[in-house]
Amino acid sequence: MVNFTVDEIRALMDRKRNIRNMSVIAHVDHGKSTLTDSLVSKAGIIAGSKAGETRFTDTRKDEQERCITIKSTAISLFFELEKKDLEFVKGENQFETVEVDGKKEKYNGFLINLIDSPGHVDFSSEVTAALRVTDGALVVVDCVSGVCVQTETVLRQAIAERIKPVLFMNKMDRALLELQLGAEELFQTFQRIVENINVIIATYGDDDGPMGPIMVDPSIGNVGFGSGLHGWAFTLKQFAEMYAGKFGVQVDKLMKNLWGDRFFDLKTKKWSSTQTDESKRGFCQFVLDPIFMVFDAVMNIKKDKTAALVEKLGIKLANDEKDLEGKPLMKVFMRKWLPAGDTMLQMIAFHLPSPVTAQKYRMEMLYEGPHDDEAAVAIKTCDPNGPLMMYISKMVPTSDKGRFYAFGRVFSGKVATGMKARIQGPNYVPGKKEDLYEKTIQRTILMMGRFIEPIEDIPSGNIAGLVGVDQYLVKGGTITTYKDAHNMRVMKFSVSPVVRVAVEAKNPADLPKLVEGLKRLAKSDPMVQCIFEESGEHIIAGAGELHLEICLKDLEEDHACIPLKKSDPVVSYRETVQSESNQICLSKSPNKHNRLHCTAQPMPDGLADDIEGGTVNARDEFKARAKILAEKYEYDVTEARKIWCFGPDGTGPNLLMDVTKGVQYLNEIKDSVVAGFQWATREGVLSDENMRGVRFNVHDVTLHADAIHRGGGQIIPTARRVFYASVLTAEPRLLEPVYLVEIQCPEAAVGGIYGVLNRRRGHVFEESQVTGTPMFVVKAYLPVNESFGFTADLRSNTGGQAFPQCVFDHWQVLPGDPLEAGTKPNQIVLDTRKRKGLKEGVPALDNYLDKM
């Protein structure tokens, strides 16, 4: 089926049990886009002969040049299963039925919406956006380098979003041709990767959860093996089918024998689970040996043997392919024998959930409102006749400058051209008017890699693009027709924007264009932050050097179209305290009638991370939350119940606790104190950076009897001053962000790595050899501040043999007292204050502390 007509696709969209929404995720350079090509060529949008070289989903010019994927792109595929394969599609909501001659049969056409996502850690926000709109993930692992740090990060994100994984081991051609591994070694390599992936799944998911068991296991067929570049792949099902007739057993029974410790004795023709001299492992004997035989015959140019194999396996070579030899013949041969497209599409159809199955258990993760209102029920049943609920996960720039398609997924109802809908931004609160627009949707479109197709309407369970809502949304949001609908939950990113660059226009007259360009940039990338400082600076914050480089290039060439001046990258810091305040701080209100007494103290280790990770949440039921705090962090239960709020922004990693005893009018000023606390934690006392891991205690409050003398104008500034004073008396410190660096290199280059890391205040905490290969993996912590130019430095010191991957990992205290002149933190504070246009020098305690 080469020519897709929109009507045919539209008909398929209604068969929601036969839809599979999936994304391809992996570590950088493990071959996602190349593998996606063989899927796309099978579904007939690229010509089959070009697959493996075109990287169809890398739509941007810089993606083709750098050979990396930067933005995630979506594409729809159509695939028809053969009759014999339909029995492998199990589960009541996994297939539609059609009537054939009065009998009900499974419908064999599947619509697969595939999203190819980037593997580079700087773009992991793109991955998050892709995961939100899909239900299944194809995890690609390079079988030579194994499970890497980024594989773990994306897999963890997938499981947190309740997305079911299937595994594919890529680059088998390298394992056979470059490393020349034997059959048993190759089996051990595969088994180790499967174990590693299952360890990650077990760590972050649970088998008794609503998704059921999601472990990957080759013997059920949710693990594929192959080579994306050469365009061939298999699961154990393909081989079991070849032998099933010969052995006279069922395919699924045979699959169990083709993996793990199952050995086949050639003399007695029996399977056993112990190895004897006569027996050989099933996987090696029946799966790998035939492949090794083909490789041996073709690569060593044994013409007669090759001809015999061609005949035996029933491969039809075209006339111009008969004269090939060596690697080109290898590709053609394997591609005809074990075509990657068929294998992968079958695995997707069998093992990934349909929207109907997935939305049952994903609804509670996705929807913020009550789980029994009309919208929630419609999402849960994926009901095309319910109210429209659609989540927009990102904006895709169009060829028309400055306009965007909104890209997202319809969870319930139908979205149609020209319909009126409510567009709810991330800050929308039900019942209020802010961040809410009621507008018509101009067009609904189908996303097809590099092309788009207009379409009348799109029902639930599908991925869609919308035209005409981009003016009302910044990065994402919810589109609905149900007036009481709550928002779909905002995405949690695994990295945080810690590197900043200030930009200005070379020609001051271009300033309006720059501002407009920054607004567009903020739309087009789910992660980047554009900040307009009060000092007039324009700041772009990103996840790392590469991310910022791409953002600035986009800004200069696509969004603002003007020449720019860029500052050197600077790092965001956080402020914290190290001990409890050495006195109870007091501040009086401007009219001297109200007094607040407070202290600050550091939080126990791990609590700030728990708040950011969502384990301890501002929206939790307060008794349940107090219980967690008391058990895990040894907080006093009565105090833990009296948490007034989290900050900054109501969700940040700082706490405001009420430890007062019997104070009058306390509730009346609570809002004002909370506002002061949000202000103080958002702009810390040292250098206006966010605070992190500080717990403030309100000890006593003396208030004026007249309500008019204790309004917000009196209390808010006072609260901020008393919080600043309590920080300054509690040994303030700066926190700097730290990358976790994973470096792969040959043994000879390890020495050079240590040298580079030591010069940059980094330290290695783990070094291990990748079993079965000469490569070493070095893991180290490296402060973000020292990471600029790290890659180039590392390559020059190791002769270009080491490849680093940096992921933001944690915050650590910068050694030294920022209040003491001449220390490094003090220098950073002074530089930051100067850059932000604040008063020079750290403010003295007397500015904030009042005498009785």
UniProtKB/Swiss-Prot annotation:
Domain tr-type G intervals: 17-356
UniProt xrefs under Pfam families: EFG_C, EFG_III, EFG_IV, GTP_EFTU, GTP_EFTU_D2
Record localization: Cytoplasm
Entry's EC annotation: 3.6.5.-
SUPFAM superfamilies reported for this sequence: EF-G C-terminal domain-like (SSF54980), P-loop containing nucleoside triphosphate hydrolases (SSF52540), Ribosomal protein S5 domain 2-like (SSF54211), Translation proteins (SSF50447)
Record PTM Diphthamide, positions in chain: H709
Binding site for GTP: 26-33, 170-173, 227-229
CDD domains, alphabetized: aeEF2_snRNP_like_IV (cd01681), eEF2_snRNP_like_C (cd04096), EF2 (cd01885), EF2_snRNP_III (cd16261)
Keywords: Cytoplasm, Elongation factor, GTP-binding, Hydrolase, Nucleotide-binding, Phosphoprotein, Protein biosynthesis
Top-level division of the source organism's lineage: Eukaryota
GO biological process terms on file: defense response to Gram-negative bacterium; negative regulation of gene expression; translational elongation
GO terms under cellular component: cytosol; ribonucleoprotein complex
UniProt xrefs under InterPro entries: EFG_II, EFG_III/V, EFG_V-like, EFTu-like_2, G_TR_CS, P-loop_NTPase, Ribosomal_Su5_D2-typ_SF, Ribsml_uS5_D2-typ_fold_subgr
One of the record's GO molecular function terms: GTPase activity
Main subcellular localisation: cytoplasm
PTM annotation (Phosphothreonine): residues: T57, T59
Similarity field: Belongs to the TRAFAC class translation factor GTPase superfamily. Classic translation factor GTPase family. EF-G/EF-2 subfamily.
Function: Catalyzes the GTP-dependent ribosomal translocation step during translation elongation. During this step, the ribosome changes from the pre-translocational (PRE) to the post-translocational (POST) state as the newly formed A-site-bound peptidyl-tRNA and P-site-bound deacylated tRNA move to the P and E sites, respectively. Catalyzes the coordinated movement of the two tRNA molecules, the mRNA and conformational changes in the ribosome. Involved in the morphogenesis of epidermal tissues.
Protein name per Swiss-Prot or TrEMBL: Elongation factor 2
Source species of the chain: Caenorhabditis elegans
